[in-house]
Amino acid sequence: TFDNNRSTRIFELIESHKSIDYKVFKKIKYDNKFPTPFNYNFMDVNNIMEMKPTEYPDVADLIEQIQNWDRSTDVNSTGAGAYAMFYYTLADKYFYKSYYDRNFSKSLIADCLVEVKKRMKKYFNSTTIKLGDFQKLVRGDKEMPIFGMPDVITAMNASTYKDGKVQVTHGESYIQLVKFSSKGTEIESIISYGSSDNEESPHYNDQMELYSKFKTKKMSFDKDYVLKNARTTYNPK
């Protein structure tokens, strides 16, 4: 089988509970941690956790940041920032799609970290970078820090943006959570940007803040409630 970080982490979380209620389900759905060890199904970078910082003085600080990291891909995590820059630099500089189960050596990882450090200094004037400083959610003129990385449950994949940063282009998008209870059907949802593709609309990017904080908005299919709380009502022409 070809398990990966996502499937491994999901299995770990599910197995840790005897039963799963709505609250626990949401916690699992929004989990953004990598498992230990990493379990990519196309490469192996676990040697990075076995490297002795003292043996690689030029990048000792980056090795320590990654090794001391709790593996959460939170926007304020410097460990996640260092690892994300390592991941995208590795893919950009060394990784080839024709190789599977590629086991990256300590020396190759060290070479990659040297390149990471150069980019950190060039674009951020620091070697301590939060994930949210490096990875952005962008829509129109709005830009904000965003969680996630490829192959965590809250997966995010990014491409080159500007000033040494990356911009999320794939991953978490429309989310709808439905609960059937004694109160009836309860629905909450969110989308990564907004509900309109019209750049002039206030709904072009008005859900980004909620989305970036793992929040949702309540939905209702009760016609009376919707009409009572509508900002405007109109008939399409």
Spans of model-derived segments:
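C-terminal/peripheral segments of proteins
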Residues: 1-43, 49, 55, 61-237
